[in-house]
Amino acid sequence: MNYYRKRLSPLPPNQPIDYKDTELLRKFITERGKILPRRITGLTAKQQRDLTTAVKRSRLVALLPFVNKEI
């Protein structure tokens, strides 16, 4: 009999996701610069929305690249 394990979020529930924290944001984007989906990151829905907003804001102020051209 299989029992489903509760998936734990990789971030604490109270931890804010800041657009200036590029080390944290880089954990959730691919080598090409795409944002990883929620099923891979394991974040909650609210954390994923906040992460997406933070990554997009970080790209606009040039802390993260839009596309990583290194192949």
UniProtKB/Swiss-Prot annotation:
Superkingdom of origin: Bacteria
InterPro entries xref list: Ribosomal_bS18, Ribosomal_bS18_CS, Ribosomal_bS18_sf
Name of protein: Small ribosomal subunit protein bS18
Subunit details: Part of the 30S ribosomal subunit. Forms a tight heterodimer with protein bS6.
Coiled coil: none
Keywords: Ribonucleoprotein, Ribosomal protein, RNA-binding, rRNA-binding
GO biological process: translation
